[in-house]
Curated annotation (Swiss-Prot):
It comes from the Bacteria. It comes from Nocardia farcinica (strain IFM 10152). NCBIfam families: miaA. It catalyses: adenosine(37) in tRNA + dimethylallyl diphosphate = N(6)-dimethylallyladenosine(37) in tRNA + diphosphate. This is tRNA dimethylallyltransferase. Keywords: ATP-binding, Magnesium, Nucleotide-binding, Transferase, tRNA processing. One of its GO terms (biological process) is tRNA modification. Monomer. ATP binds at residues 9-16. SUPFAM superfamilies: P-loop containing nucleoside triphosphate hydrolases.
Length: 313
């Protein structure tokens, strides 16, 4: 019986490469679980694998939103779960790859989301609109310090949602999250990490490569498609900083530095989140035998070799 495999962990550790290798070995299909890779056209700054590098393996939950649309954890959960179940029904192995923390938990733990109240939400949205993300972050820090430490300080929408839940339930935002138990579908969760110094160097190289590969031009093109109006997309690491550069808030070198610092901070949050989950089986992304080690950890789930002819998606 096939079970899904999840490959999670911090940014730039090598999750995508391992996910591809496992999908090849397990006759699998990839389900993306990186929130910013949901967006069409956000390719360079999210390190999205080009189609030519996907080895003919079908990928799901990539390029499903326009930059003007708002990403929703609940919507992702519903759509990605349908993808996982369809892959299983085809007799293939879902390989879930990415590092967006709440998206991972929502999918694998079947998170039931609290109700919403338009009046309460509108109050916090007014604060966001009139005083900005710093004021919303301060309010969240006062109401729920743990949530404020977990949610990206520039993610106004998610902070508004957290404040709404705290006000409606009288409990911390995390209290609405599922308890950690057996993952949905019996998913086996692999985590990929690297030595901190090595990962910092990889992030620096990747950030430089993004700018050298045309991130500024990509953002300019997305502005023409409505990026500035996008509630979620415009706040993505790198994209927000290039927008600030285009608005003459600072120069290009400062945009690069802010992108690098933002990525490193995000990595620390990812590490803290995933390391708390005892179900994750950790792997060293620098291990030359990474794929072999991962397959050994998977045990019986990796016993059936790939046999189905692939079609490029």
């Amino acid at each position: 019986m096939r079970v899904p495999i999840a490959v999670v962990g911090p940014t730039a550790t090598g999750k995508s490469e391992l996910g591809l290798a496992l999908a090849e070995h397990l006759d699998g299909e990839i389900v993306n679980i990186d929130a910013m890779q949901l967006y069409r056209g956000m390719d360079i700054g999210t390190a999205k694998l080009p189609v030519a590098e996907r080895r003919g393996i079908p990928h799901h939950q990539l390029d499903v939103l326009d930059v003007t649309e708002t990403a929703s954890v609940a919507t992702y959960q519903r759509n990605a779960a349908a993808d996982v179940e369809a892959i299983l029904a085809r007799g293939r192995t879902p390989v879930i790859v990415g590092g967006s923390m709440m998206y991972v938990q929502a999918l694998l733990d079947d998170w039931e989301f609290p109700a919403t109240d338009p009046a309460v939400r509108a109050k916090w949205e007014r604060l966001l609109a009139t005083e900005g993300v710093a004021a919303v972050h301060a309010a969240l820090r006062a109401a729920d310090p743990a949530a404020a430490a977990t949610i990206l300080p520039t993610d106004g929408r998610r902070m508004v949602r957290a404040l709404e839940v705290v006000e409606l339930t009288g409990k911390p935002f995390a209290a609405s999250a599922p308890r950690i138990g057996t993952p949905r579908w019996g998913t086996i969760i692999l985590g990929v990490d690297r030595d901190t110094a090595e990962l910092d160097e990889r992030i620096a190289r990747r950030t430089a490569l993004m700018f050298d590969s045309g991130l500024v031009a990509e953002v300019r093109g997305l502005v023409e498609r409505g990026l500035r109006e996008g509630v979620t997309a415009r706040r993505a690491i790198g994209y927000a900083h290039v927008l600030a550069y285009l608005d003459n808030e600072y120069d290009l070198e400062h945009a690069k530095e802010r992108t690098l610092i933002g990525t490193r901070r995000y990595v620390r949050r990812q590490r803290s989140w995933f390391r708390r989950d005892p179900r994750v089986r950790w792997l060293d992304g620098a291990d030359p035998g990474l794929v072999t080690t991962a397959l050994a950890l998977l045990g019986d789930a990796a016993a059936a070799p790939a046999t189905t002819e692939r079609t490029t998606q």
